[in-house]
Amino acid sequence: MSETETGNDGIKLVMAIIRPDKLADVKTALAEVGAPSLTVTNVSGRGSQPAKKGQWRGEEYTVDLHQKVKIECVVADIPAGDVVDAIAEAAHTGEKGDGKIFILPVEGAVQVRTGKEGSPAV
């Protein structure tokens, strides 16, 4: 991804929704590009994946929300495009449900422990 596409000036939040079983691969890939700091949240949602139908104890049910992992990585010194490329490559299976990646501008940051602000806080 080019720097122009990611608006690579300032602090960026790269947020990705991926398959839970790809988390270890993504963490490794992020560390390799110099972005080891991240926040991980278990989430459920629905994209283009179809709902799954099943039966349990004779009752039919539909699972229309799929378990995913949300990764948030704030970067300032590393191009957001490098982070996006690392996540996309590590999370890719080629199947529906691989996930999505979003890049958002961050207006500011403060490191609570030191009081640093802006890029140094990241």
Swiss-Prot record:
The record describes its post-translational modification as: Uridylylated on Tyr-61.
User: Record's InterPro entries?
Assistant: N-reg_PII, N-reg_PII-like_a/b, N-reg_PII/ATP_PRibTrfase_C, N-reg_PII_CS
Q: Knockout consequence?
A: Deletion mutant shows growth deficiency in medium supplemented with nitrate.
Sorted alphabetically, the Gene Ontology cellular component annotations on this record are: cytosol
Q: What induces it?
A: Highly expressed during ammonium starvation under nitrate-rich conditions.
Q: Which cellular compartments is it found in?
A: Cytoplasm
Q: Which SMART domains did the record assign?
A: P-II
Q: Which Pfam families match?
A: P-II
Q: Does the keyword Nucleotide-binding apply?
A: yes
Q: Name one GO molecular function term.
A: ATP binding
Keywords per UniProt: ATP-binding, Cytoplasm, Nucleotide-binding, Phosphoprotein
Q: What is one process in the GO biological process aspect for this record?
A: regulation of nitrogen utilization
For the modification O-UMP-tyrosine, which residues carry it?
Y61
Q: Where does ATP bind?
A: T39, G47, S48, Q49, V74, G97, D98, G99, K100
User: Main subcellular localization, coarse class?
Assistant: cytoplasm
The residues that hold ADP are T39, G47, S48, Q49, V74, G97, D98, G99, K100
Query: Which family does the entry's similarity section mention?
Result: Belongs to the P(II) protein family.
Quaternary structure, from the entry: Homotrimer. Interacts with the glutamine synthetase 3 (GS3) in the presence of 2-oxoglutarate. Interacts with Amt1 after ammonium shock.
Reported function: Involved in the regulation of nitrogen metabolism. Regulates the activity of its targets by protein-protein interaction in response to the nitrogen status of the cell. Increases the activity of the glutamine synthetase 3 in the presence of 2-oxoglutarate. May regulate the activity of the ammonia channel Amt1 via direct interaction.
Q: What is this protein called?
A: Nitrogen regulatory protein GlnK1
* Record lineage: Archaea, Methanobacteriati, Methanobacteriota, Stenosarchaea group, Halobacteria
The gene it comes from is glnK1
